[in-house]
């Protein structure tokens, strides 16, 4: 397989289309198509679904994984030869709550690594592993303890979420001194919000139809929506603590949600990936429960 063709495949997946890949590679769209056709001919498989955005087929995912590993190792080799970093890309899948709470110290660490670039893909912690399997990222924060084939896994710690709402909302939706979980407005982060989707487990018997649900797809915006009374929600302990201390919100009951988090990364002999792993683990130890 031609390394140039593999790099072209990776660029298409990262950029989302053949046209965007042609701009990134400074070649014509027809040249991009010719390279992919040549690669598909060499392996005898269709590698890219021509959708918007373009996605790798099952066979293509295998080559995308290989291409991403090669790109990292090639960049590190250039570093060793030139004694400098050459815009080495580190791609990570992470959930929004982690990104807004314990993960930021990683930025401070990576900032001192020369020309290294960090690309984050935000997804629910129950779904970040799919990006790792597809080769879209080199590492992922996930709730899955079982390693993906070809990856190693490290336990990071436990993220605790608290059920909170404004005192006014709590007072307005109360039945016999308890929160009226069925009628109280609730918040969701998005369609893949596994944590919030299970918020009524242990609180209400059976399914509840037609709840009043607002969707706020931003960790910071979600917290503000809770603080300003749009609905109740499960907030990370670190995010909820200052609001509770200020009296902006109250904890609705003692039922908390503890989610173990893990770091999964490709098993590569990569100094930079090892340094990134150390930075992630250190940040998690400082910001998560054990």
Curated annotation (Swiss-Prot):
Gene3D superfamilies recorded: 3.40.190.290, Winged helix-like DNA-binding domain superfamily/Winged helix DNA-binding domain (1.10.10.10)
GO MF term (any one): DNA binding
SUPFAM superfamilies: Periplasmic binding protein-like II (SSF53850), Winged helix' DNA-binding domain (SSF46785)
Record feature DNA-binding region, as residue ranges: 18-37
Limits of the HTH lysR-type domain: 1-57
Function of the molecule: Positively regulates the expression of the exporter LysE.
PANTHER family: HTH-TYPE TRANSCRIPTIONAL REGULATOR ARGP, TRANSCRIPTIONAL REGULATOR
Family: Belongs to the LysR transcriptional regulatory family.
Name of the molecule in the record: Lysine export transcriptional regulatory protein LysG
Organism name: Corynebacterium efficiens (strain DSM 44549 / YS-314 / AJ 12310 / JCM 11189 / NBRC 100395)
Gene: lysG
């Amino acid at each position: 397989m031609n390394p140039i063709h593999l790099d072209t495949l990776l660029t298409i997946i990262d950029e989302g289309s053949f046209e965007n890949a042609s701009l990134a590679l400074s070649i014509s769209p027809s040249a991009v198509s010719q390279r992919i056709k040549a690669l598909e001919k060499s392996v005898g498989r269709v590698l890219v679904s021509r959708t918007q955005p373009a996605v790798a087929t099952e066979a293509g995912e295998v080559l995308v994984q290989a291409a991403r590993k090669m790109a990292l190792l090639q960049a590190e080799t250039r570093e060793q030869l030139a004694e400098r970093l050459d815009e080495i890309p580190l791609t990570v899948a992470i959930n929004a709550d982690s990104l807004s709470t314990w993960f930021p110290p990683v930025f401070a660490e990576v900032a001192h690594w020369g020309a290294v670039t960090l690309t984050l893909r935000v997804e629910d912690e129950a779904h970040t592993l799919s990006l790792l399997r597809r080769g879209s990222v080199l590492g992922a924060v996930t709730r899955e303890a079982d390693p993906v084939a070809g990856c190693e896994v490290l336990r990071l710690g436990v993220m605790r979420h608290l059920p909170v709402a404004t005192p006014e909302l709590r007072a307005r939706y109360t039945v016999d001194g308890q929160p009226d979980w069925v009628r109280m407005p609730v918040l969701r982060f998005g369609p893949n919000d596994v944590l919030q989707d299970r918020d009524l487990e242990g609180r209400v018997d059976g399914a509840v139809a037609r709840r009043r649900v607002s969707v706020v797809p931003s960790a910071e915006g979600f917290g503000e929506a809770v603080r300003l009374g749009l609905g109740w929600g499960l907030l990370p302990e670190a995010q909820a603590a200052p609001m509770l201390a200020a009296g902006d919100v109250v904890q609705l009951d003692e039922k908390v949600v503890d989610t173990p988090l893990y770091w999964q990364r490709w098993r590569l002999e990569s100094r930079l990936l090892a340094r990134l792993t150390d930075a992630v683990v250190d940040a998690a130890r400082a910001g998560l429960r054990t």
